[in-house]
Amino acid sequence: VKGNVLEGKYFIINKYCTIVLESKAQLILNAPFYFGNKRIKGSRLDSRLLIESGGRMEIKYGSYNVAYGADIEVFQNAILEIGGELGANIGLTIICADHISIGQHTGCGRNVTIRDNNGEHFISIRGYKTSSPVTIKEHVWLTESCTVMPGAVIEPGAIISARSVVSGHIPAFSIVK
């Protein structure tokens, strides 16, 4: 974990969180990172963070708050970059096997899923890749229970409506229903 409390670069872990940072994993903090924040006093809903060997997660700019019930997994040699200055509500799931970039001022509602891979499932199609980078630019709003799939590029200011599934290119300042 790379941070500096005196410079405001720290990691706050709340009760009922499981953190696994394997050998050579990196958690780089350029701002405060709050993990597993609870709104309901006494809740035991756990949050999980796994960064496998060679994986890297970086909070780039302003503070980032992840509410309880989160599951963030950064696989071997994968990169997860979060711009900061906002956060995610309860139930965030991020599965990163390649590269996921989330821009500044991007908010996630309840039960949002972001993934850049399909779980290593074998599909017999020439040229098929099991993962593809995801880019979510700044000032994006991912609303309740939406899913961002491998290869998605979401331009600035877009809003992804509740229970939408997104793949491919989403233009700036658009609303996906």
Task: Locate predicted features.
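A generic "structured core" feature
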Residues: 137, 159-161, 165
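Extracellular carbohydrate recognition
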Residues: 152
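Short helix N-cap motif at coil->helix boundaries in the Bergerat
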Residues: 168
